[in-house]
């Protein structure tokens, strides 16, 4: 019998249309642009924070620093709350978007890498090929999907975004972003960001 050939997944490129100054010492883990405001989650133990940044100048306008034991990771905006993960401490933080005051904490059983939402549930990655869907009020898992391309697992899923009905995940230590079907976990396309 003939061997079935794996179908090539479409790859898109990019065009840089604008550049902005940025704090070179910030180990960026998540970015959110909302109503003219730029929010950033930064990592590294002893240097992790959530900050509001002036897009045009790169100046930090507000900052909320994490305790030194936490390594900040991905972040998403849910209603008027910023939700930030930490890497290995299995602890997440909830902040008031306006004041950056920490208003709640929550826990999860895996590492925390990236987070986004689909307007109904939070979606979290842990560096594996699994995406976890969480209730945004209780932070309890509601389902999970395995991410694959041609039936092969795609792991190292890092920060996430929800774009036009798809989950976009950057792949740690690569220049690629996977476009993922949120129902099946199948990679439907790639963005190749080589050169940025």
What are these regions (language model features)?
Residues 7-25, 55-61:
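A short helix->beta-strand "capping" segment at the edge of beta-propeller domains
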Residues 17-49, 64-76:
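Beta-strand-rich domains and repeat architectures in extracellular enzymes and scaffolds
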Residues 19-24, 63-68, 104-110, 145-152, ...:
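Surface loop/turn motifs at the tips and blade-to-blade linkers of beta-strand repeat domains
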Residues 26-27, 46, 69-71, 88, ...:
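Beta-rich catalytic cores
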Residues 35-36, 79-81, 119-121, 164-165:
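Short coil/turn segments that connect the beta-strands within blades of beta-propeller domains
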Residues 39-44, 82-89, 124-128, 169-173:
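Conserved beta-strand positions in repeat-built beta-propeller and related beta-rich domains
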Residues 54-58, 96-100, 136-139, 181-185:
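Short loop/turn segments that connect beta-strands within beta-propeller blades
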Residues 58-94, 100-112:
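Blade-loop segments of beta-propeller domains
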């Amino acid at each position: 019998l003939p061997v079935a050939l794996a179908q090539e997944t479409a790859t898109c490129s990019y065009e840089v249309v604008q550049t902005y100054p940025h704090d070179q010492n910030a180990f960026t883990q998540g970015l959110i642009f909302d109503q003219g405001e730029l929010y950033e989650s930064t990592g590294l133990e002893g240097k992790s924070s959530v900050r509001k940044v002036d897009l045009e100048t790169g100046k930090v306008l507000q900052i909320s620093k994490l305790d030194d034991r936490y390594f900040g990771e991905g972040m998403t905006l849910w209603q008027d709350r910023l939700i930030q993960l930490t890497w290995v401490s299995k602890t997440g933080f909830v902040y008031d978007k306006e004041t950056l005051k920490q208003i709640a904490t929550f826990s999860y059983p895996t590492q925390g890498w990236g987070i986004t939402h689909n307007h109904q549930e939070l979606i979290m990655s842990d560096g594996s090929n699994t995406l976890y869907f969480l209730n945004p009020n209780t932070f309890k898992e509601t389902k999970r999907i395995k991410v694959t391309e041609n039936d092969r697992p795609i792991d190292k899923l890092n920060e996430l975004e929800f774009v036009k009905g798809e989950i976009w995940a950057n792949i740690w230590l690569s220049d690629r972003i996977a476009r993922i079907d949120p129902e099946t976990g199948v990679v439907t396309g790639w963005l190749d960001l080589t050169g940025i």
